[in-house]
Every structure is written in C-alpha cells, then in structure tokens.
UniProtKB/Swiss-Prot annotation:
Coiled coil: none annotated. HAMAP family: Ribosomal_eS28. This is Small ribosomal subunit protein eS28. Belongs to the eukaryotic ribosomal protein eS28 family. The gene is RPS28. PROSITE patterns: RIBOSOMAL_S28E. GO terms for cellular component: cytosolic small ribosomal subunit. GO terms for molecular function: structural constituent of ribosome. Disulfide bonds: none annotated. Keywords: Ribonucleoprotein, Ribosomal protein. The keyword Ribosomal protein applies. It comes from Kluyveromyces marxianus. The keyword Cell membrane does not apply. GO terms for biological process: maturation of SSU-rRNA; ribosomal small subunit assembly; translation. Pfam families: Ribosomal_S28e.
C-alpha cells in the first residue's frame, strides 16, 4: 500500500455472522467515519469485533447477505 492509494476508514457497528466454507470470514455492517449516515455490509477476514476501525481500499462494493 503506497501513500497515493486513497483509503476509507469505517467503524464496525454490528457483527452479522460467519461465512465462508470454514467460517473464516465474518460479515459486518460498517459505518463510514467521514459520512456517518452511510452504512454498508462487508466481509472481513480475521478477528473483528464491534467498535473496530477498518481501512477499506475500496468502499463502493457491498457484500451479499448471508443465507
């Protein structure tokens, strides 16, 4: 990651559940720090909990909902 890559900071407001073939991915709802009215659902690999701040390299894509 170089200094020219634009990133977006987002705060985890709710952990929705585990997904992936072995449950190695967590689906979370995040709220953007710059625009707190906007929330999206993302998939996160690794440990995550409510209140964590994520650095999103791409902030437009939203994850599909769990079944």
């Amino acid at each position: 990651m170089d200094s020219k890559t634009p990133v977006t900071l987002a705060k985890v407001i709710k952990v929705l559940g585990r997904t992936g073939s072995r449950g190695g991915v967590t689906q979370v709802r995040v709220e953007f720090l710059e625009d707190t009215t906007r929330t999206i659902v993302r998939n996160v690999k690794g440990p995550v909990r409510e209140g964590d701040i994520l650095v999103l390299m791409e902030s437009e894509r939203e994850a599909r909902r769990l079944r």
